């Protein structure tokens, strides 16, 4: 299979490329990435001689068309993803997430190429903390941030192109990921690298917000399963049934790093901070036989901490800029 991976130099995309090559799942991989602050050549350095990396904008219709024409399938990760950045400036999110997805859809329509579109559980809004319900494939969309609204718009474009033009596409909505190569602006790597650089970890508000955590390799194994075995036009929800509130995750990280679990600062909460995300992955499990492998959250966190300890040269150049932005916001 000749595979085009958009956003393949970002966190989840780069890990997907590593997984596909590690398990010999494809004959060739082309990565299209704008290499903005969140994309890094270094994330692909271990496999650089086995892929083709093209730097370019996902909205460049001519470039995208040429790359899609050479491919048997496209996995579309490319997106702006950080909620705090979307609150400060939503325009790049509209550009990449909405116009970028439209550009991909037009290219795969023209060349009749299989597409898998990667999305987020944030399109469903949030759940009350005391509500046992979980998101499933029939949950109505109710996005609450500039980020999630652009991802919801992208999902709906994919659905419309499937129905109107017969595009061969699937969608997945996944819960919060963790693992290697995640940018230090994100919650888990921020706390790990704060400890490693002698800074105090920072927790938004009281830390009661609940997230459903999944290791990035489990997410990507599900994406591959959907790409190869999923039903065209379907949406699949990906989760590992690992709900933790942010306070618990913070204390677990500190404990695993040999620190006092209460040695952190409470900082200003995010505006409109969603309360709880929770995914019911039963359709994916029952229909496609997928199951996560990284089911021990503490073991997964330990591996992630070890990766950041061993790869300071990857994240250290990013750290000061990220923390300066957080400091400006009182976070």
From Swiss-Prot:
Keywords, sorted A to Z: Lyase, NAD
Cofactor, free-text remark: Binds 1 NAD(+) per subunit.
InterPro entries (UniProt xref): dTDP_Gluc_deHydtase (IPR005888), NAD(P)-bd_dom (IPR016040), NAD(P)-bd_dom_sf (IPR036291)
The UniProt record lists the keyword Transcription: no
Gene3D superfamilies membership: NAD(P)-binding Rossmann-like Domain (3.40.50.720), UDP-galactose 4-epimerase, domain 1 (3.90.25.10)
Binding site for substrate: 81, 120, 176, 186-191, 202-204, 211, 246, 269-273
EC annotation from Swiss-Prot or TrEMBL: 4.2.1.46
Pathway in which this enzyme or protein is active: Carbohydrate biosynthesis; dTDP-L-rhamnose biosynthesis
Cited Pfam families: GDP_Man_Dehyd (PF16363)
Catalytic residues in the record: 121 (proton donor), 122 (proton acceptor), 147 (proton acceptor)
Source superkingdom: Bacteria
Enzyme class, UniProt record, top EC level: lyase
Catalytic activity: dTDP-alpha-D-glucose = dTDP-4-dehydro-6-deoxy-alpha-D-glucose + H2O
Stored CDD domains: dTDP_GD_SDR_e (cd05246)
Molecular function, one GO term: dTDP-glucose 4,6-dehydratase activity
Co-factor(s): NAD(+)
Gene Ontology annotations of biological process type: dTDP-rhamnose biosynthetic process; polysaccharide biosynthetic process
Residues bound to NAD(+): 11-12, 33-36, 57-58, 77-81, 96, 147-151, 177
UniProt similarity note: Belongs to the NAD(P)-dependent epimerase/dehydratase family. dTDP-glucose dehydratase subfamily.
Subunit structure of this chain's protein: Homodimer.
NCBIfam families: dTDP_gluc_dehyt (TIGR01181)
Function: Catalyzes the dehydration of dTDP-D-glucose to form dTDP-6-deoxy-D-xylo-4-hexulose via a three-step process involving oxidation, dehydration and reduction. Involved in the biosynthesis of the dTDP-L-rhamnose which is a component of the critical linker, D-N-acetylglucosamine-L-rhamnose disaccharide, which connects the galactan region of arabinogalactan to peptidoglycan via a phosphodiester linkage.
UniProt-recorded name of the protein: dTDP-glucose 4,6-dehydratase
Organism, scientific name: Mycolicibacterium smegmatis (strain ATCC 700084 / mc(2)155)
Organism lineage string: Bacteria, Bacillati, Actinomycetota, Actinomycetes, Mycobacteriales
Primary gene name: rmlB
């Amino acid at each position: 299979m000749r595979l085009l991976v958009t956003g393949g130099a970002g966190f989840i995309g780069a890990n997907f490329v590593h997984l596909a090559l590690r398990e010999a799942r494809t004959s060739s991989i082309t990565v299209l990435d704008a290499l903005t602050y969140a994309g890094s050549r270094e994330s692909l350095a271990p496999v650089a001689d086995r892929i083709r990396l093209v730097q370019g904008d996902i909205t460049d219709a001519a470039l995208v068309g040429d790359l899609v024409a050479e491919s048997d399938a496209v996995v579309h990760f490319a997106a702006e993803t950080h909620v705090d950045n979307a609150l400060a400036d939503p325009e790049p999110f509209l550009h990449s997430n909405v116009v970028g997805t439209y550009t991909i859809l037009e290219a795969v329509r023209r060349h009749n190429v299989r597409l898998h579109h990667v999305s987020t559980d944030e399109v469903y809004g949030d759940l009350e903390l005391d509500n046992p319900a979980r998101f499933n494939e029939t949950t109505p969309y109710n996005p609450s941030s500039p980020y999630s609204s652009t991802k919801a718009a992208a999902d709906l474009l994919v659905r419309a192109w499937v129905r109107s033009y017969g595009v061969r596409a699937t969608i997945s909505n996944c819960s919060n990921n963790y693992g290697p190569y995640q940018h230090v602006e994100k919650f888990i790597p921020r706390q790990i690298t704060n400890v490693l650089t002698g800074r105090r970890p920072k927790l938004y508000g009281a830390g009661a917000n609940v997230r459903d955590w999944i290791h990035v390799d489990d997410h990507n194994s599900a994406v591959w399963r959907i790409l190869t075995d999923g039903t065209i036009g379907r949406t699949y929800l990906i989760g590992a049934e690992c709900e933790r509130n942010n306070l618990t995750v913070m204390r677990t990280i500190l404990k695993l790093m040999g620190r006092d679990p209460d040695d952190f600062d409470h900082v200003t909460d995010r505006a409109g901070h969603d309360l709880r995300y929770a995914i019911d992955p039963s359709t994916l499990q029952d229909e496609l036989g997928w199951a996560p492998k990284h089911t021990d959250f503490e073991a997964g966190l330990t591996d992630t901490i070890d990766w950041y300890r061993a790869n300071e040269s990857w994240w250290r150049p990013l750290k000061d800029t990220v923390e300066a932005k957080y400091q400006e916001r009182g976070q």
